[in-house]
Curated annotation (Swiss-Prot):
Interacts with HDAC1; the interaction prevents binding of HDAC1 to CDKN1A/p21 and facilitates the acetylation and stabilization of CDKN1A/p21. Interacts with p53/TP53; the interaction inhibits binding of p53/TP53 and MDM2. Residues 534-545 have a biased composition (Pro residues). It comes from the Eukaryota. It is an enzyme of class 2 (transferase). It is found in: Cytoplasm; Cytoplasm, Cytoskeleton, Microtubule organizing center, Centrosome. It comes from Homo sapiens. Residues 116-224 are annotated as: Required for interaction with HDAC1. The keyword Transferase applies. Residues 107-134, 443-473, 528-569 are annotated as: Disordered. Its EC number is 2.3.2.-. This is (E2-independent) E3 ubiquitin-conjugating enzyme FATS. It holds the Pfam family Centro_C10orf90. The keyword Transferase applies. One of its GO terms (biological process) is protein ubiquitination.
């Protein structure tokens, strides 16, 4: 799960009342019913997502009010949209069961799976703001699960153009080619998508889930990603070999509210693909691409320089899009996903994340990515990626806007930030980050270099055009390279994907009159050759700060549980040998030095002992005295001296006085002296007393 959070992003033109509208769009049916039946029989072994559960969390205190304030036209449009899809389902024979299940307790909208009605077309424009307190989404959770088809499940149509003009303009990447629409081969590429739209205070949240159905035709795989680009499609007329890549594509469109400054959005999107036994004995390479396009729009100034609150309309309506170079007409196009995920069958998943915001924060322009893959051998797939980012100037608020992307299990590798100052009212910066999980082997990342004055030392570069009031444009080169970055979500690191730790990508807008920023995330390249395994699902999520986002799905949980095998992790010694051989060599040199020092000390001690043993017999024979121990405190050397006669008498007297007989004799003598003195004192006292008595008698 990929979590994105935005802070400090508010919009002043939103209404006061909370409105929720559900709009479901469905494409037209352009193929014959027999072709659908063949495709259904060919894809019986393919495990696909059978239902999408969308839940939007709203404050409990306002849930009843939102349920009561739901406009009648929205409910009618919702019912008509589902009636249209039901009628399309009755016209087609595709056995793909899908149902939208919303939480009625939360949204106050009944589940549309059992409704029926005439076919209708939804208007693409957004709802006007209504009165009510201004509040943003607390959280939006989008989940995809594999469940059994219900008794009255909707049968969705496939291929062709969308009923909604928005989706027709936005879904250019997943158009089915004309070569497959003629029904010449039963194992062709089929497409079905679901588009829901929630309108709340002029802020729309949309989810589009297109999926590529892969059929089997004489054990050959056919892959189509773009109708307009001939290099991205493999026609059944030219069958591919067993080494060709098999691609499954899916995307999620999400436009979030700008009201809540501290909002967190969770997107959990899974893609189920068929897993077959390996056709060859040798292991293969498995690669997948995860692309994130985050677009921001300003909520302060419009194209004419007036605040959006004055015009009472979002800036996306006022700003028109245009490209410097390209062959597609983007007028009226509101979003182009630019998302593609490729899987080489029966191998572990390797993922690359390329996240770019070529537009200003909260502007009305969006990036366009065209990913083209070509077969270059057994296990080599090349990508030619071109980005045409068109940006507009926007007013930067005084407080620092912050965009944080949390991807569990990923960690920082490198951060490069470069801000360029152009005119007095414009600044443009670009942040390039390298993110990676614990793969088995990593290689240096090769980055895309933009057109213009680019230096080889910079990972990314921003251009500032000279026009002070017109929109600026960016155009990236389209080099043919081997996937610039990969990520290996192997089973040994799947536990870390469930933890809360992750990658945080923060882009703080510099202060100035107008600010534009580009945010690019690239993942280091990783290659792993092993037995076929099925990766865990690796969903991605758009952030609340940008206007639109795209997330790439992973495989379903049931496939991963039944097919995935544990991958052996590298030990510490093997990892050091691969990544830091110098560390091992230096450690070995230090150990050798320590051993040499120990041997030298032992030899020195032996020499000292030999010298002492040779000197001891000479000293003992010559002089008789004690030799002090070298480690003792008594390190002085005793000297030979002669004792005088007086000293000898004094010593003898001390010895004599300390004898017990002598001590006793001295004690008796002392007592006799005391007794004699006491007797003398008694006699003197008697004499004095007698004299006094005689004198008194005389008187």
């Amino acid at each position: 799960m990929l979590k994105l959070s935005g802070e400090g992003l508010r919009d002043s033109y939103h209404s006061r009342r909370d409105q929720i509208a559900l709009k479901n769009l469905q494409s037209d049916v352009t193929e014959a019913k027999s072709d659908f039946t063949k495709e259904t029989l060919a894809s019986q072994n393919t495990k696909m997502i059978s239902s999408i559960v969308i839940s939007q969390m709203i404050d409990e205190n306002k849930s009843r009010e939102n349920r009561a304030s739901l406009p009648l036209p929205c409910a009618i449009a919702q019912s008509r949209a589902h009636h249209a899809k039901q009628s399309l389902a009755n016209r087609s024979g595709v056995n793909i069961h899908r149902a939208f299940a919303l939480l009625p307790g939360r949204l106050g909208i009944p589940a549309p799976s059992d409704e029926r009605g005439p076919e209708a077309e939804l208007p693409p424009k957004e709802e006007r703001p209504c009165g009510g307190p201004r509040r943003g989404f607390a959280s939006i959770t989008i989940t995809a699960r594999r469940v059994g088809p219900p008794a009255r499940a909707l049968v969705w149509g496939t291929a062709g153009d969308s009923l909604c003009p928005k989706c027709r303009a936005e879904d250019t990447l997943f158009q089915a080619p004309p070569a497959l629409a003629n029904g010449a081969h039963p194992g062709r590429h089929q497409r079905s998508f679901a588009c829901t739209e929630f309108s709340r205070n002029s802020s729309v949240v949309r989810l589009k889930v297109p999926e590529a159905h892969t059929g089997l035709c004489e054990r050959r795989k056919y892959w189509v990603t773009h109708a307009d680009d001939k290099e991205t499609s493999f026609s059944p007329d030219t069958p591919l070999s067993g080494k060709s890549p098999l691609v499954f594509s899916s995307c999620v469109h999400l436009r979030v509210s700008q009201q809540c400054p501290d909002s967190i959005y969770y997107v959990d999107k899974s893609l189920s693909v068929p897993i077959e036994p390996p056709q060859i004995a040798s292991p293969k390479m498995h690669r997948s691409v995860l692309s994130l396009n985050l677009n921001c729009s300003s909520h302060r100034l419009t194209a004419d320089g007036v605040d959006g609150l004055v015009n009472r309309e979002p800036i996306s309506e006022a700003l028109k899009q245009e490209l410097l170079e390209g062959d597609q007409d983007l007028v009226g196009q509101r979003w182009n996903p630019g998302l593609q995920e490729s899987h080489l069958k029966e191998t572990p998943s390797l993922r690359r994340v390329h996240l770019g915001t070529g537009a200003c924060p909260w502007s009305g322009s969006f990036p366009l990515e065209n990913t083209e893959l070509a077969n270059v051998g057994a296990n080599q797939v090349t990508v030619r990626k071109g980005e045409k980012d068109h940006t507009t100037h926007c007013h930067a608020s005084d407080h620092a806007n912050q965009l944080s992307i949390h991807i569990p299990g990923w960690s920082y590798r490198a951060v490069h930030t470069k801000v360029f100052s152009g005119s007095s009212k414009r600044q443009q910066g670009e942040v390039c980050m390298t993110v990676s999980a614990p793969p088995v082997e990593q290689k240096p990342t090769r980055h895309f270099l933009p057109i213009g004055d680019s230096s080889p030392s910079d990972d990314c570069l921003s251009r500032d055009l000279s026009e002070p009031t017109e929109r600026r444009h960016q155009s990236f080169l389209k080099p043919r390279i081997l996937f610039p970055g990969f990520l290996c979500p192997l089973q040994d690191v799947c536990a870390s994907l469930q933890e809360d730790n992750g990658v945080q990508i923060e882009s703080k807008f510099p202060k100035g009159d107008y600010t534009c920023c580009d945010l690019v995330v690239k993942i280091k390249e990783c290659k792993k050759s092993e037995d076929p395994t099925t990766p865990e699902p690796s969903p991605a999520a758009p952030s609340p700060a940008p206007r639109d986002g795209a997330g790439s799905p992973g495989l379903s949980e049931d496939c991963s549980e039944s097919q995935q095998t544990p991958a052996r992790s590298l030990t510490l010694q093997e990892a050091l040998e691969v990544r830091k051989p110098q560390f091992i060599s230096r450690s070995q040199e230090r150990l050798k030095k320590l051993e040499h020092m120990v041997q030298q000390r032992k030899a020195q001690r032996k020499e000292d002992l030999r010298q002492k043993q040779s000197l001891l017999p000479i000293r003992t024979s010559k002089k008789q005295f004690t030799i002090p121990h070298p480690l003792s405190d008594n390190l002085f050397k005793p000297k030979e001296r002669c004792i005088s006669e007086k000293e000898m008498h004094m010593r003898s007297k001390r010895i004599y006085d300390n004898l017990p007989e002598v001590k006793k004799k001295k004690e008796e003598q002392r007592k006799r002296v005391i007794l004699q003195s006491n007797r003398l004192r008694a006699e003197v006292f008697k004499k004095q007393l007698l004299d006094q008595l005689l004198q008194r008698n005389a008187v």
